[in-house]
């Protein structure tokens, strides 16, 4: 977050396997976000969220931040930082307390959430997010906001997201070496969900899948609450490796081939064409049947999506045993750079047997022609988190000023009367 004299600015920083992106947004009077600064560079020194060369990744972060500062004409002092790696873990927990007075107060909610998160988590992990799913008061279930309601006992169900302490610490260290403070570390899957999912989709049930370069993040929402989240440590880069191996070419060439000619659906029988790769690498075989390339890409995408489908089925069985509702009426929402592959919707619908859409981030304005592609969903979601912090600060200021006004009126009344 950056507080300037006349602007409310928020900065998102995504340090991914393939790219580092810095985005500067201005929170407008109507609480919309206007993009005013953008900086990116290719990632070096990091793979699947794990830093393997601190100096290299610090250099990338600094370059990305510098570009965004120049475009936005501001100095970046703090950022909202995304995090995704195989050491992310999630668990659902319950907290129960007696209601202190006749009705639920803000303090009761803080207390019951504290109880819910005071559980054993994985060794060397710390909690990133505690997300309330629903509250129950006595025999009243499915309550979203219990403040002011009466009862004897309150229960909360929460979704905990944890990460390995050292993994998070090293990413933060890299950012701080650029003289920038981290306002909050946010799981990438949550950030992407914030950027691409609608409220209706979350209420009806939806699975958001962000296919990045090194990892796949996915989240499942039912009845407006997050029920499950996970990171799969394979994504777009493994497809690139498959192409490189299958056709004996470098990873850079394989990536270019994937972007330029890649698809997960073969053309109609008899219409497969020869692809001339001589412009990419003179040592590479000059012609290749399009079908051969698609075979490699499609088989890997089916495998990756099937890993998510297995987890969806597992959660479905788990909730069914508990007698809890499980429906994904809104289907599957794909995003991330890996979702740009041609015909992915058709391929995914076969795997999930549900409706599928590829989502771009929404609810932003400004320099949107640069950053409305699926590959920027995470960093845009970070801005939405920053916006919410501003909104909360404004609410507290209003509450404080309200009590100040009341106090002054009472004080003035006493002066007049006595």
UniProtKB/Swiss-Prot annotation:
It is a peripheral membrane protein. The keyword Cell cycle applies. GO terms for biological process: FtsZ-dependent cytokinesis. GO terms for cellular component: cell division site; cytoplasmic side of plasma membrane. It comes from the Bacteria. Pfam families: FtsA (PF14450), SHS2_FTSA (PF02491). Keywords: Cell cycle, Cell division, Cell inner membrane, Cell membrane, Membrane. SUPFAM superfamilies: Actin-like ATPase domain (SSF53067). The keyword Cell membrane applies. It is found in: Cell inner membrane. HAMAP family: FtsA. Cell division protein that is involved in the assembly of the Z ring. May serve as a membrane anchor for the Z ring. Belongs to the FtsA/MreB family. Self-interacts. Interacts with FtsZ. PANTHER family: CELL DIVISION PROTEIN FTSA, CELL DIVISION PROTEIN FTSA-RELATED. This is Cell division protein FtsA. It comes from Buchnera aphidicola subsp. Acyrthosiphon pisum (strain APS). The lineage of its organism: Bacteria, Pseudomonadati, Pseudomonadota, Gammaproteobacteria, Enterobacterales. The gene is ftsA.
